[in-house]
Curated annotation (Swiss-Prot):
Keyword Protein biosynthesis annotated: yes
Keywords: Aminoacyl-tRNA synthetase, ATP-binding, Coiled coil, Cytoplasm, Ligase, Nucleotide-binding, Protein biosynthesis
Known role: Catalyzes the attachment of valine to tRNA(Val). As ValRS can inadvertently accommodate and process structurally similar amino acids such as threonine, to avoid such errors, it has a 'posttransfer' editing activity that hydrolyzes mischarged Thr-tRNA(Val) in a tRNA-dependent manner.
Catalysis performed (reactions): tRNA(Val) + L-valine + ATP = L-valyl-tRNA(Val) + AMP + diphosphate
Protein known as: Valine--tRNA ligase
CDD domains for this protein: Anticodon_Ia_Val, ValRS_core
One Gene Ontology cellular component annotation held by this UniProt entry: cytosol
Subunit structure: Monomer.
HAMAP family, per database record: Val_tRNA_synth_type1 (MF_02004)
Organism whose genome encodes this protein: Agrobacterium fabrum (strain C58 / ATCC 33970)
Cited InterPro entries: aa-tRNA-synth_I_CS (IPR001412), aa-tRNA-synth_Ia (IPR002300), Anticodon_Ia_Val (IPR033705), M/V/L/I-tRNA-synth_anticd-bd (IPR013155), Rossmann-like_a/b/a_fold (IPR014729), tRNA-bd_arm (IPR010978), tRNAsynth_Ia_anticodon-bd (IPR009080), Val-tRNA_synth_C_sf (IPR037118)
Entry's EC annotation: 6.1.1.9
Coiled coil residues, start to end: 879-943
Protein's UniProt keywords contain Transmembrane: no
Length: 947
C-alpha cells in the first residue's frame, strides 16, 4: 500500500540515485532507431554561483522540454557546463586569501594565484550543479564542460587567432567601462545604473583674449529676447567636475541663437590653461542646463563621439585606480606653457582620488569667482556590479572584435526565419542591438581567464598565434626578413636563446563572454570534428532570459555562423529557436534584490514544498511574455495538486485498481470509462501541442484541470458506486481503465513533476513486480481513442451537477439540505440521460426528486444545460429574509470597496506616482469585485423573487 503522505525529502534523493545508476540522462537514452536529435546547451552558470529563482525557472523549462523529447524517443542531449566567471571568481579567491591571511594576488604572482583559483574550483566550485540536480535537471552529467577546460581553451585559441588573421580582431585605443576598484575594463552587463542625489555645477569658462558676446537674460511672452548682458565667458554645467581637467572643447547646438556668434572662438580652460574651441554639434541640447556642454573625449562615451566628429583631442587625466594624473602626463602637458601660477592647483590635485579632486576643483573655481551656481540634481550613475563603485569611462588600449561585420549574417538569419525568437517580439530587441552594434571590447585586466594569445617583440610588433613557439617562429621570420635595427638584436638573442627574451606575452585575459559565445559547438569538441559535433550540432532550442540577448545570444549567433559550416560551406545557425522567458519577481511584482529583502531562495522552497511543487508552479505561471509573480502560497497550492494525485492513487489502490497489461481502450464498454479515455486523448494531444510551441503554462494548466477536475473530482467520484457495486465485469473494466489512465497521467506529468511521478510509477508496477523501465525512459503518451458521444454525455452530467452546486453555493443553501429539481424543456435525449444518471444526480447534487415541469417555479435558481432548464426552488431551502439581509450587507461592503478603489484610480496623482504594480493590483481587484457584485445581485434577485 502506498504511504499515506508523500515525503519529498526522502523520495527525491532515492529517485535521483535511481536515475544516476541507470544513466537515464546520457545522450541518446531512450532514443528510437534512426531518431532525430534534440539538443539543448545549458546557459552555463558561473562557477561561483548558487541556485537562484532565475536559474530555477530557466532550468525547469529546459528540463520539461528535455524530458518530453526524451520520452518521445528522440536522441536527446542536454549539455551541462559552467562558466569560469573571470571577475567574480578572481574576487572570491582574493577574498579567501585575505580571510586566511595569505599573501595577496600581486604578492604571490600570476602563476601561483591561478593555481590557487584552480584549487578553489576543485574544492568549492560547481556547487550549483548539485543544486540543479535537486531541482531534477536531467542533463547528461557525464559530459560536464567548463569554459577553462583544455578542449574549450583550444576552441578559444582557434577562434581568436582566426579572427585576428581575418582582421576581425584588432587592438585599438577606445573608451571602455573602467572599474577603478578592480582596475579592469568591464562589460555593459557588469554595469548597474544607480540613481543618486548629486549636484549640477555651473562653471564659467573665460573666452580667449577678452572676446565678448551678448547673452539674452530676459524674454517677452513669445520667447523673443528683450534684454541682454555682455559676457566674456560661457557657462557649462557638469555632474563630474573632476573630468574638466581633460576638456578639449565646449559644444553648443548649431541652432542655438545664444551662442552662434562665438562658435569657432576659444575659451581658456581654468586650472589647466589650455585653449579649447567652442564647436557646434547636435549633441548639445539647447533646453538642458545652459545649452553649452564641456567635451571630455577621454572620459565620456558621448563626448568621445563628439570629439571624433569635431576633431578634438582625447586627454586621459586619471590613473587606473581613479586618481588624478597630470603633472607627468605627457598628453595633458602637450601644448601647455606651464605657467607657474597654475602649479599650485596642480600640486593640490595630483594623485588625489577622483572624488576628492572633485571637491578641490569646485573650491578652486569658487576661489577664482568662476563658480556660477550649484543645483541639486538627481541622476543615474553607472556602477560596477562587482566592485560596487562608479565606473569611469576610460580611454585605453584594448582588444576589440569587429562586431559590425560579424553581425550581418546573424541579422539575416533571424530576418529570413532560420532562427526564430519565442515570443516573437524579442526579435525587435535583437535587431535593435544588432543594427546599432558597437565594437566589442574583449580584453580584461585580470589574471583568471583565457590569456590573450598575443606576444610583443622588442619594438612592440604584435604576433598572434596559438602557442608561444608559433609566435616565436613568426617573430623570427619577421625580424630576420627585414633589414632594420632589430635584426642583429634578434640574431644575437637566438644564439644564446632563453624563453621570454625575445617576446613578451600580453597579460590581459579575454572577456568571459568570449568563451561563452562558442558554447554550442565548443562543448561538442570543436575544433576537432568529433562524432558528437556531427550528431548534435546545430542545437534545437536555446532557453534563456531576455537580459543576455545582447551579451550571449547575439555573440553565439555571430560565432556560430562564422565558424560552423555545412557540407556545402554554408553557415549553420547554432540553434533554430530562442525561447526567451520572463523574470521571476516577488508576489507584488517587485524585482527581487538583496537590498529590498525580497529574495526567495529556491532551495528553501524545495526543502519546504518539494522540487515538484516548485517546478509545477514555475511552469504554470510561465506565460509567454509575462513575468512570474512568485508567491510561496501558490507553491503550497500546487503541492496540494501533487497530494491530490497521490491520494487518488491511494484511493484507486484501496479499490482494487491495478495495472492490466492487456487492457485496451477500445474494449471499454462503460460510458464513464469511454469518456475518461476520450478526455485523456484530448489532454495528451493538447499538452503535446502546447509543449511543441513552448506554451508551458498552457500545458501544465491542461494537465491540472484534467487530473484534478476530470479524473479525481469526477471520474473517481462517479466510479465509487461501480467499485462498491455487484457488477463484477463493470468493476474489472473500471479498475483496469483507472489504472491505465493513472499510468498515462504519470507519463504526461513527468516532465513537470518528475520525482513524484517516478515514485508512483515504480509503486504501481503491481505486487511483487518491477517496471521494465524508469518512467523517464518510457514512451510519451499518444492515445487516439475517441468516443464523442460518451464524452458529450458525461460532460452534460458534469455541467448539470456543477451548475446545481454553484447555484446552491450562491444562494447559501445549507450543504446537508436536499432539494427537488424541476426540469423544463427537456427533449427525449435529455430525458433519457436524466433517467440513466438519476442516481448520480441525486447523490452528487443533493437532490431528493427530479421531475419534469412546464414552467420554472417562481423564485427558483435556474441552470441552463443544453436545451433544458433545470430549476432549483428556493422557498423551502433557505431563510429568505435572513438570506436577503446577508446579501444586501455583502453588496454594501463590495460597493464601499469599489468606491474606495474608484477614488484612487480617478486620482491622477496616485496613478502617476504610485508603483505600477500597486496601480495594476488595484485594477485587478476592481475587476474581481465587478464579478463578485454581479453574482451577489443575481442571487439577491432570486431571493427576492422567491419571497
Amino acid at each position: 500500500m502506498l504511504e499515506k503522505t508523500y515525503d519529498s525529502a526522502s523520495v527525491e534523493p532515492k529517485i535521483a540515485k535511481a536515475w544516476d545508476e541507470a544513466n537515464a540522462f546520457r545522450a541518446g537514452a531512450n532514443a528510437k532507431p534512426g531518431a532525430e536529435t534534440f539538443t539543448i546547451v545549458i546557459p552555463p552558470p558561473n562557477v561561483t554561483g548558487s541556485l537562484h529563482m532565475g536559474h530555477a525557472l530557466n532550468n525547469t523549462l529546459q528540463d520539461i522540454l528535455v524530458r518530453f523529447e526524451r520520452m518521445r524517443g528522440k536522441d536527446v542531449l542536454w549539455q551541462p557546463g559552467m562558466d569560469h566567471a573571470g571577475i567574480a571568481t578572481q574576487m572570491v579567491v582574493e577574498r579567501k586569501l585575505m580571510e586566511n591571511q595569505l599573501p595577496g594576488r600581486r604578492e604571490m604572482g600570476r602563476e601561483a594565484f591561478v593555481e590557487k583559483v584552480w584549487e578553489w574550483k576543485a574544492e568549492s566550485g560547481g556547487l550549483i550543479f548539485n543544486q540543479l540536480k535537486r531541482l531534477g535537471a536531467s542533463c547528461d552529467w557525464s559530459r560536464e564542460r567548463f569554459t577553462m577546460d583544455e578542449g574549450l581553451s583550444e576552441a578559444v585559441l582557434e577562434v581568436f587567432v582566426t579572427l585576428y588573421k581575418q582582421n576581425l580582431i584588432y587592438k585599438a585605443k577606445r573608451l571602455v567601462n573602467w572599474d577603478p576598484k578592480l582596475q579592469t575594463a568591464i562589460s555593459d552587463m557588469e554595469v548597474e545604473q544607480i540613481e543618486v542625489k548629486g549636484n549640477l555645477w555651473h562653471f564659467r569658462y573665460p573666452l580667449e583674449k577678452g572676446v565678448t558676446y551678448e547673452y539674452p537674460v530676459a524674454f517677452d511672452a513669445d520667447g523673443t529676447p528683450t534684454e541682454f548682458e555682455t559676457r566674456d565667458y560661457i557657462v557649462v554645467a557638469t555632474t563630474r567636475p573632476e573630468t574638466m581637467l581633460g576638456d578639449t572643447g565646449v559644444a553648443v547646438n548649431p541652432e542655438d541663437e545664444r551662442y552662434k556668434g562665438i562658435v569657432g572662438k576659444h575659451v581658456i580652460l581654468p586650472i589647466v590653461g589650455r585653449k579649447i574651441p567652442i564647436v557646434a554639434d547636435d549633441y548639445a541640447d539647447p533646453t538642458a542646463g545652459t545649452g553649452a556642454v564641456k567635451i571630455t573625449p577621454a572620459h565620456d562615451f558621448n563626448d568621445f563621439e563628439v570629439g571624433k566628429r569635431c576633431g578634438l583631442r582625447a586627454i586621459n587625466v586619471m590613473n587606473i585606480d581613479g586618481t588624478i594624473s597630470i603633472k607627468e602626463n605627457e598628453d595633458f602637458l602637450e601644448g601647455l606653457s606651464h605657467p607657474a601660477a597654475l602649479h599650485g592647483a596642480w600640486d593640490r590635485l595630483e594623485g588625489q582620488d577622483r572624488f576628492t579632486a572633485r571637491k578641490i576643483i569646485v573650491e578652486i573655481f569658487e576661489e577664482a569667482g568662476l563658480l556660477d551656481k550649484i543645483e541639486p540634481h538627481k541622476h543615474v550613475v553607472p556602477h560596477g556590479d562587482r566592485g560596487g563603485v562608479p565606473i569611469e569611462p576610460r580611454l585605453t588600449d584594448q582588444w576589440w572584435v569587429d562586431n559590425k561585420t560579424l553581425a550581418q549574417p546573424a541579422i539575416a538569419s533571424v530576418r529570413e526565419g532560420r532562427t526564430n525568437f519565442v515570443p516573437k517580439n524579442w526579435e525587435n530587441t535583437y535587431f535593435q542591438w544588432m543594427e546599432n552594434i558597437q565594437p566589442w571590447c574583449i580584453s580584461r585586466q585580470l589574471w583568471w581567464g583565457h590569456q590573450i594569445p598575443a606576444w610583443y617583440g622588442p619594438d612592440g610588433q604584435v604576433f598572434v598565434e596559438k602557442t608561444e613557439e608559433e609566435a616565436l617562429q613568426a617573430a623570427i621570420q619577421h625580424y630576420i626578413a627585414h633589414e632594420g635595427p632589430w635584426k642583429a638584436w634578434v640574431e644575437e638573442k637566438l644564439e644564446n636563446f632563453a624563453p621570454g627574451e625575445i617576446l613578451t606575452r600580453d597579460e590581459d585575459v579575454l572577456d568571459t563572454w568570449f568563451s561563452s559565445a562558442l558554447w554550442p559547438f565548443s562543448t561538442l569538441g570543436w575544433p576537432e570534428q568529433t562524432p558528437e559535433l556531427a550528431r548534435y550540432y546545430p542545437t534545437n532550442v536555446l532557453v534563456t532570459g531576455f537580459d543576455i540577448i545582447p551579451f550571449w545570444v547575439v555573440r553565439m549567433m555571430q560565432m556560430g555562423l562564422h565558424f560552423m559550416k555545412d557540407d556545402a560551406g554554408n553557415p549553420v545557425e547554432p540553434f533554430s529557436t530562442v525561447y526567451i522567458h520572463a523574470l521571476v519577481r516577488d508576489k507584488n511584482g517587485q524585482k527581487m534584490s538583496k537590498s529590498k529583502g525580497n529574495v526567495i531562495d529556491p532551495l528553501e522552497l524545495i526543502d519546504e514544498y518539494g522540487a515538484d511543487a516548485l517546478r509545477f508552479t514555475l511552469a504554470i505561471m510561465a506565460a509567454q511574455g509575462r513575468d512570474v509573480k512568485l508567491d510561496p502560497a501558490r507553491i503550497a497550492g500546487y503541492r496540494n495538486f501533487g497530494t491530490k494525485l497521490w491520494n487518488a492513487t491511494r484511493f484507486a489502490e484501496m479499490n482494487g485498481v491495478k495495472r492490466d497489461p492487456h487492457f485496451l481502450a477500445e474494449t471499454a464498454s462503460l460510458t464513464i470509462n469511454r469518456w475518461i479515455l476520450t478526455e485523456l486523448a484530448n489532454t495528451a494531444r493538447d499538452v503535446t501541442a502546447a509543449l511543441e510551441n513552448f506554451r508551458f503554462n498552457d500545458a501544465s494548466g491542461i494537465l491540472y484541470r484534467f487530473v484534478w477536475n476530470q479524473f479525481c473530482d469526477w471520474y473517481l467520484e462517479l466510479l465509487k458506486p461501480v467499485f462498491s457495486g455487484e457488477d463484477e465485469e463493470a468493476k474489472r473494466e473500471s479498475q483496469a481503465c483507472a489504472a491505465y489512465v493513472l499510468e498515462e497521467i504519470y507519463k504526461l506529468l513527468h516532465p513537470f513533476m518528475p520525482f513524484m511521478t517516478e515514485e508512483l510509477w515504480a509503486h504501481t508496477a503491481g505486487e511483487g513486480e518491477e517496471r521494465d523501465d524508469l518512467l523517464c525512459l518510457t514512451d510519451w503518451p499518444e492515445p487516439e481513442f475517441r468516443d464523442d458521444a460518451a464524452a458529450a454525455e458525461i460532460n452534460w452530467l458534469i455541467d448539470l451537477v456543477s451548475g446545481i452546486r454553484s447555484a446552491r453555493a450562491e444562494m447559501n443553501v445549507p450543504p446537508g439540505a436536499t432539494a427537488s429539481l424541476v426540469v423544463v424543456g427537456a427533449n427525449t435525449s435529455t430525458e433519457a440521460r436524466l433517467d440513466r444518471h438519476a442516481a448520480a444526480i441525486r447523490r452528487l447534487a443533493r437532490a431528493d426528486e427530479i421531475r419534469g415541469g412546464d414552467v420554472a417555479p417562481k423564485g427558483s435558481a435556474q441552470i441552463i444545460v443544453g436545451e433544458a432548464t433545470v430549476c432549483l426552488p428556493l422557498g423551502n431551502l433557505v431563510d429568505l429574509a435572513a438570506e436577503q439581509a446577508r446579501l444586501e450587507k455583502a453588496i454594501g461592503k463590495v460597493d464601499a470597496e469599489m468606491e474606495r478603489i474608484d477614488k484612487k484610480l480617478s486620482n491622477e496623482k496616485f496613478v502617476a506616482n504610485a508603483d505600477p504594480e500597486v496601480v495594476a493590483a488595484e485594477r485587478e481587484r476592481k475587476a474581481e469585485l465587478d464579478v463578485q457584485l454581479a453574482s451577489l445581485r443575481t442571487a439577491l434577485t432570486r431571493v427576492s423573487e422567491a419571497g
